């Protein structure tokens, strides 16, 4: 879900930024020096290393790297991260010619890439998820949408607390609202799914048009930007990822979150292993299993939604209106909903 790229060998790295857009590439290794990085790359040939492409945020990269490093794979893989749209485009265009041996990516993109290119292997390890998933995917994270509010600004400006997304069409929020453009961030798709599911496409477009009008210049390209703007006191209301708002509130910031009555829709990111025939890197399947078996505890500390049997969710992190869109989430549906969003723009 980010635009930056990182290169990691061995121990986990943390990227230079956490936004979903435009960052400078960064590389680190376990010894934190460029000389050591070059030495590590030289001593371990690229043929032996598993190349992992990912759209994940910093926290997820950290958790996955920790799982691999702590279970014998230090120095045996390379992580490279991309924005969701960029990596999705590579999957669809390149198929099995992709340089990567393994990807972690928005599941809806993986589905479309598999249908178009038949590029992923069936996983050879047990994936005991709470809900049925394609046999070539194992989910690593689930992220829900919610309304985010700055409690101090609401009070200072006598603004009502919204209870649903349709409330955001009220002109009282003009100049106080930030949302994300679905053309640049899949986070915004959570808002689109909720509106379309509740009101149908035509009314959803009308509602979205009024929301965009109230947001004005704050139709952001980054999914985390509305929360950041709320934290900085630049806007009073935003739409973003629920777990990030929960964390901000727990840190003592004047941030709260509202589960919209239209529903808390979610997107998952999953791991998949590329099928390259005789050139398939066998260690990629081992690493995929390692991430799921040894990384989920840390992953769930950042992305609390339960995905696997035996996992639980505390009351704070349990949304009030969890819902699933009526149609299967695919890149093609994402494109269609982007068209609705474009038509709604001023």
Tell me what each language-model feature is.
Residues 19-39:
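Bacterial lipoprotein signal-peptidase II cleavage site
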Residues 47-78, 249:
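Short, polar/charged alpha-helical segment
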Residues 148-153, 268-280, 299-302:
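A bilobed periplasmic-binding-protein/Venus flytrap-type ligand-binding module shared by bacterial periplasmic
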Residues 313-346:
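Extracellular/periplasmic bilobal clamshell ligand-binding domains
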Residues 130, 172, 176-183, 207-212, 219-220, 251-275, 290-312:
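Periplasmic-binding protein-like
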Residues 107-114, 231, 236-254:
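A ligand-binding cleft/hinge motif common to bilobed small-molecule-binding domains
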Residues 51-62, 82-85, 99-231:
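Extracytoplasmic ligand-binding site segments that recognize negatively charged/polar headgroups
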């Amino acid at each position: 879900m980010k635009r930056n790229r990182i290169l990691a060998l061995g121990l986990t790295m943390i990227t230079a930024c956490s936004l979903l857009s435009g960052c400078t590439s960064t590389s680190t290794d376990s010894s934190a020096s460029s000389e050591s990085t070059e030495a590590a790359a030289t001593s371990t040939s690229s043929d032996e290393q598993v190349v992992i492409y990912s759209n994940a945020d910093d926290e997820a990269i950290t958790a996955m790297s920790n799982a691999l490093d702590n279970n014998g794979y230090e120095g045996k893989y390379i992580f490279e991260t991309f924005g969701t749209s960029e990596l999705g485009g590579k999957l669809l265009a390149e198929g099995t010619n992709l340089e990567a041996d393994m990807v972690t990516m928005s599941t809806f993109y993986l589905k479309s890439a598999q249908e178009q290119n038949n590029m992923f292997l069936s996983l050879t390890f047990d994936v005991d998820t709470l809900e049925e998933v394609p046999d070539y995917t194992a989910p690593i994270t689930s992220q829900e949408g919610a309304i985010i509010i700055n409690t101090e600004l609401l009070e200072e400006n006598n603004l009502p607390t919204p209870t649903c997304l349709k409330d955001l069409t009220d002109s009282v929020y003009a100049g106080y609202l930030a949302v994300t453009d679905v053309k640049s961030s899949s986070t915004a798709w959570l808002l689109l799914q909720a509106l379309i599911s509740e009101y149908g496409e035509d009314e959803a477009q009308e509602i979205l048009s009024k929301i965009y009008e109230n947001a004005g210049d704050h139709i952001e390209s980054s999914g985390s930007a509305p929360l950041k703007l709320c934290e900085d006191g630049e806007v009073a209301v935003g739409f973003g990822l629920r777990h990030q708002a929960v964390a901000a509130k727990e840190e003592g910031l004047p941030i709260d979150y509202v589960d919209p009555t239209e529903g808390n829709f979610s997107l998952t990111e999953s791991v998949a292993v590329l099928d390259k025939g005789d050139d398939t890197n066998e260690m990629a399947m081992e690493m995929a299993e390692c991430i799921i078996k040894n990384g989920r505890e840390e992953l769930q500390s950042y992305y609390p939604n339960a995905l696997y049997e035996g996992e639980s969710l505390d009351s704070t992190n349990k949304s009030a209106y969890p819902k699933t869109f009526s149609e299967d989430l695919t890149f093609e549906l994402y494109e269609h909903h982007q068209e609705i969003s474009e038509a709604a723009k001023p």
